Amino acid sequence: MKRRNFIKTAGISAAAALVTPGLEPGTSDSYSGNSKDQISPASVKVKDNIVYIETFSLSAVIDKGIVISLKDKASGEEFIEKPDTTNFRALQLLYRNNELSNINEEKFGNTEVHQISERRAEIVFHSWDGDGVLTITADDQTGDLMIEPSASTSRPGVLACRWNITGLRQSLELVAPFFQGIKLKLNDPLIKNIRWGWPFQWEAGLAMFQSEKGGFWVHTQDNKYRFKAIQTGTQDDPFTIGFDSEAYGPIDDNLSAGGLCWRINTYRGDWKVPAERYRQWYWQAYNLDAEEKLRQKWINDISFAISWCPGDPAILDALSKKISPKKVLIHFPNWRTDNYDENYPTFIPSESAKTFIKKGQQMGFHIMPHFNSIDMDPSNPVYSYVRDFPYRSVENKQLQGWSWYNRRVIGVPESNTNRLNNQDKKVMVKIHPGLSIWRSILGQNMLKPVNELSLDLVFIDVTLCIWNIHNCLVESMPPTEGMNKLIKHVSELGPGLVVGGEGLNEITAQRQSFAQVHLFRSSQDSIEGIERSGGCNLNQVLFGRLVKTFGYSNLSGRNKDTETRMQLHLEHGAVPTVTISLADEIANPNASVKRMLELANG
């Protein structure tokens, strides 16, 4: 078994440039959007209970919370074509199992519209099952239309407040940070009726709707780790997009949700225009100029990667004859005396691994032994310190982690006894990264092999696994903030470490230097239509100045499917990556592996 089939949560059309990516170079600090020279101030006006918004870049009309018109001011392009003000629900409360409760006028409700100031209005909803407020503001500086939805009810169990945009023009393409970047028609089956949680699936808080010469985009400027989600379509209507503001778990007694502001604006050109504006905000919000300066210069030399590399020294010899070792990143999973994914967080190197790592270091290779960030074996003695702080589902409270039996995931035992006595089934429980004692134990246990093996880089698994959970706040931190702190803690062990991790999003990118990334809903086996998921390197644009990505699994080049997977990673901006079992696959490469080596060599 090379890797568990754990990440199956939420598809090559355009050829990637035949250039090995480096850390993304800096781009202009000026936003190349619409000019606001000699324009009127932004305004929000209420007339006959309809809200009219004007900024230097857009004009919009909102009726009962529904955007019935959204136009780019420079071109006059309209992005809403069939808004439904009769049956559609703009504001909703979300409960467990995707149950929605409408906040609107049906069942004897009413809607009020209030002019608050020259640039602000409120739409207040009083419905049978709850009340809500939609605050509408025009930002004079950015030209953004700002929407802040909130809703409350007497019924406990609220997970999120959803605000929907309906009637999107059918020719638009969605560009969004799902699996490193997608650019798909709104009615593409790959994204039909899916809720993408941030940041595990929705890897940054923005979405762009691209037309032939421009588009509009929606984003939130949130640096407080608040959970959110985007809903792409409904079962019956692919041209609806929902934006969720989540409440932290536990939600059993929760009666309300909201607090996030969604910013809407138009742009001319392609999606990289708003993506760059978001990157600039992101850099400032998290002080990433300082993080960028911490990156080691040798990272830019990396142009080739091997994922799940066996520990055969002959592989190093074969590689050295094909490419300079200083250009090669090696992800090394089976280096401990324990079996893979057993007995974490114990990290004791085997004698054969010591030989492999030492030889590789002497030759100049960059070898990343595989550790784990939050998964631990409950049969390990450390469990007694942290057993009260596991991940539990925000909806059903089940323990989260994994067990593996007969080549399939079977979940975590809820029996306290069975949880402790099934190491052979690779039982692992996720521990909240906000827990200081966990970070301390993990760091201490990692530092021993770091010193013994003279490591300067490590790989920590499942860093992408950060989402809203039942016990969401530990030491006042959600898992997102806790993971950020954990990655930084690992990077500061000993003399300092370069950190690689699994997946890439706007939280983990801040201190990771390498990211092993998944293809679209295809961590192991490729889904039907995966070839349509390429051609968009959005996350490379957002995070490429901080992180280099490399491929995940099934990258042998032995058949058409693995060739496609290798190409898709290139299109997302990853360095050429292969997965092999034997040294001969490097010494006598097939056509696809040979191509990856040629690309890596420039």
Identify the role of each PLM range.
Residues 243, 253-259, 264, 436, ...:
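Active-site-proximal substrate-binding groove within the catalytic cores of carbohydrate-active enzymes
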Residues 51-329, 334-335, 350-353, 359, ...:
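Carbohydrate-recognition beta-sandwich/jelly-roll modules
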Residues 21-50:
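C-terminal segment of N-terminal export signals and the immediately downstream linker at the start
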Residues 331-333, 442-472:
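Active-site groove signature of glycoside hydrolases
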Residues 299-310, 336-350, 423-440, 468-479:
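The substrate-binding groove and active-site-proximal loops of carbohydrate-active enzymes
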Residues 325-404, 489-499:
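Acidic/aromatic-lined carbohydrate-recognition and catalytic surfaces
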Residues 5-26:
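N-terminal export signals
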Residues 373-448, 536:
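Active-site-adjacent "subsite" loops/lids of carbohydrate-active enzymes
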